[in-house]
Every structure is written in structure tokens, then in C-alpha cells.
Amino acid sequence: MARRPDEEYDYLFKVVLIGDSGVGKSNLLSRFTRNEFCLESKSTIGVEFATRTLQVEGRTVKAQIWDTAGQERYRAITSAYYRGALGALLVYDVTKPTTFENVSRWLKELRDHADSNIVIMLIGNKTDLKHLRAVATEDAQSYAEKEGLSFIETSALEALNVEKAFQTILSEVYRIISKKSISSDQTTANANIKEGQTIDVAATSESNAKKPCCSSS
């Protein structure tokens, strides 16, 4: 939503991180928002979020990133947090095939609960573990194309492509919001003129000219 010029940001975008437990969602969050990485990061309990303000397409955007727990017992809790999300990063671990296989389940849940226009990016994390890779880049790319998702591989440990991933999804969200704003403004303007109504511009201008610029009290 647009903010007044005197506030510190123009837009607030909510983005959710989803995927199985242990795929590195929390470290992607901390790397992007604080440029930190914790080797002994524990599984998120419930829901956490962090923010970062940055420039997107020349506008100041406050990104509110929600880190949702991947454990089954928290699924009912986290489903409520899909509401209001404009973007989603669906993360799997390139060293664990099961986490990639479960992507379709996460995607279905996301599409069931989130806005139909939500921007979704598939992320293959932990590319630094090259010797343990078990999910081919080509397979993930093919799946992403089939489902209409953008795709990127990252390493939160090495800070590889993390910034690019968030910048890409935020830019896409901004483009969609911008189009909606323009469309909304046009709709509002058109709504003020009833179908078939004739407006006498000259009469309106003359009427306005006769009105005093201020009233005395």
C-alpha cells in the first residue's frame, strides 16, 4: 500500500518463506535482513519475521519476510500467515531429494491459502555442498517452468544469489502492484462519470471561476 511522502517507505511487501524443515529458510532470512549466517541454526518454532528496507525500481520498499516452520505440527498455524502475502519463496535443499519432492505439496498449500496473484519463486538452497548435491538444476528448472515459477539456486552460507533472489521477487511484486494501482486509479476516475452522462466543461469552468477562493468568517 502506498505511503505518504513523510513516512520512511513507499510500500510494505509481505513475503513468506516456505518449505520443509531444515532446508535453510531461517538462514536465507538472516542473510538477507542482517547479512548473518548461523551454522547451528535451529528449526523455527511457529513463525518468525524480520524486515529490511531497500530500493526497488526507484521506490523505497520495506520487505517484511516471514519464516514459517516446516514441521507438520505447525502447518495449521502457519496457513493463516499466507493471507496478505504478496510473494513466496519456496525453498528446498539441493542435497535432499525428499525436500524437492515435497515442493509440490507446499505449492498446493500455498495456492489454496494465498492470493491467486502471489509471486512465487522456487529456490534450491545449499549449493555450497557441491559434493552432496542430489537434485539436478535441470530438474528443478523444468519443474519451475511447468508450474510458472521463477527459479534460482542459492547458498545462504556463501551469500550466493540470496540478494538477487529477494530483489527479483520484490521487483516482480512491485511491477504487479504498480499495474494494479494504475488500473485502480483509472477505474476510480471512470466510476465518477456515469455511462451516458454529458459534462459541460465550459459551464463547469465558469461556475468554478465565480466561486470565491476562500470564505470569510
From Swiss-Prot:
Intracellular vesicle trafficking and protein transport. The keyword Lipoprotein applies. This is Ras-related protein RABA2a. Keywords: Endosome, Golgi apparatus, GTP-binding, Lipoprotein, Membrane, Methylation, Nucleotide-binding, Palmitate, Prenylation, Protein transport, Transport. Disulfide bonds: none annotated. Residues 215-217 form a propeptide. A lipid is attached at residue 214 (S-geranylgeranyl cysteine). GO terms for biological process: cytokinesis by cell plate formation; protein transport. It is found in: Endosome membrane; Golgi apparatus, trans-Golgi network membrane. A motif (Effector region) lies at residues 41-49. A lipid is attached at residue 213 (S-palmitoyl cysteine). It is a lipid-anchor. Expressed in root tips. The modification Cysteine methyl ester is found at residue 214. GO terms for molecular function: GTP binding; GTPase activity. The keyword Repeat does not apply. Belongs to the small GTPase superfamily. Rab family. GO terms for cellular component: cell plate; endosome; endosome membrane; extracellular region; Golgi apparatus; plasma membrane. GTP binds at residues 19-26, 67-71, 125-128, 155-156.
